[in-house]
Amino acid sequence: MIRIAARNANRSTAIRSISTTSIRLNTTQKVVVTPPPVATEGELPPPQPKVTPPKATPPPPPKTKRFSLFGFLLKTTLLASVVYGGTLYAATKNDKVMDFVVDNRLPYHEELLELIETGSIDDLQQGLDQLKSKFGSVKLPSKEEIDELAQKLEHKGEDIIKETKKKFTATRTGTDLTPSEQLQKGVEIESVKKDVPHLPLIELNSELGSSVDETVKQTIASFNNFIQTIDASTLASKNDKLIASINFSISQLASKLNGLTKSFDEELQKKLKVSQTELFSSFTKKELELTENLLHQFTTEKQQLEAKLNEKLNQEIQASRTAISQAATNAVSMVRIEQTKNFEKLVTEKLNEERNGRLANLDKLNDRLTELEKFAEGFETQIVSNHKKALIQQAVSKLKSLLLAPAANEKPKSIKPYVDELSKIAADDEVLKLALKDLTPLLSNESTHSILTNAQLLSRWEQLAPELRSASLLPPNAGLLGHLASIVFSKLLLPVKGVKQDGKDIESVIGRVESSLARGELDVAVEEAANLKGWSRKLANDWVVEGRKRLEVEFLLGLIESESKII
């Protein structure tokens, strides 16, 4: 488009500009301000018209942002590309997403997945370098050539405008109105006459018209629009030659541009064919490599799956064998149990038949046998008890004879074997076990002559009596002289005849002990000796221990003998 901008005052051109794209005409009327008439003397000044200031126009409303279809399509395309690429990238990391992509057969998913998995920045750079090397020989018109062509067209347009401007005159019609009336009168717009002669338009040949670039066609259309605005009636006929030369130049320019375009297309087609052949061969090689890799992977996966399936099949076969074997064992066991039950039932029925027939009196015989068994068991228990009782009594009698009345001419013997034998015999009775438990410590280290008899205890007491008499005469805290005096004075004491029951002196105690030993009352004699006080009690301590030992042995043996009679 060619634009011409002009400011016209008195129908003359003030500013003119021509660009390579458009020409625009703008004309504005210059307002002529006339001075007010000078009033002469004696005359009234003319009334001045009241000028109202123009009202302030409100600011224009803000322009609303219009809907852009191109922006909407661009954003939608970018969003879809990001979602699609993210889905394919997630498919390489997740098997479920991969199954979704394969099942739905998304477009170009195989090529894009291969590019994501095997592609790299080096491969992308290599592909760009190959494209640059293939299309580098194709020569496009440079920016300088396009600018030069545009400048030529601009200069030719300026020349045409200058030639036409010389013939172009504008007439201005005056007016008889006063300045005040001119101010009050509105701006009049003159209508353009329709019947205006025009210059001949620029036209291309029919051969070039179909192959000329769209930009050239738009430039020619702009020139034609400009030519139509020029009034041909005021121009000389010699300008027709100028228009014809311009038409011829534009035709030559279009033909050259068409030739360049055709040569560029031919060269581009050749390069595309060569690149297509190379890409097809590389694609074939890549396809063969991928096929081999896929076959290798398929074979490997197949072998792994076969191994896993064989292992799983062997496990299932082994489990089935175990289950079948166990089921067979259970079935055989159940059959055996059932056969055993049937056999027992059959034997029971046969026994019942025999019992009801020839063995009708078998129950009575069985009852008699039961009674006989009970009698035999009771008799056997009684025999065992009597035998046990006899053995215990014999052992107790043997111990008594050895301990309480040993023979003077016999050698001393250990009592422990007799006590152990008695313990074995009386192992089932609790009373005997407790008695033997107390008797064993007493007799474990004793012999047949270590337990003193009543006569031996009496003779020892008689030997101890002088020492007791002398000890009773000792004063408290006596020294050597006190001991000698007690020995002398004890010789002077006369023995007491008879027994004094309530006497507390030493002679009464000695007499009661001797009397009790003579009667065989050892427990009374030991009690009297144990009640002594002071030094006399210490002197009689050994005799009291021996007496108590004999009393304990006699008591335990008597308890064992009594319990053996009760058994």
UniProtKB/Swiss-Prot annotation:
Topological domains, Mitochondrial matrix: 26-68
Coiled coil: 284-383
Topological domain ranges for the Mitochondrial intermembrane compartment: 92-567
Segment annotated as transit peptide: 1-25
Annotated membrane topology: Single-pass membrane protein
Keywords: Coiled coil, Membrane, Mitochondrion, Mitochondrion inner membrane, Transit peptide, Transmembrane, Transmembrane helix
Subunit and interaction comment: Component of the mitochondrial contact site and cristae organizing system (MICOS) complex.
Protein's name in the database: MICOS complex subunit MIC60
Organism: Candida tropicalis (strain ATCC MYA-3404 / T1) (Yeast)
Organism lineage string: Eukaryota, Fungi, Dikarya, Ascomycota, Saccharomycotina
Gene from which this protein is expressed: MIC60
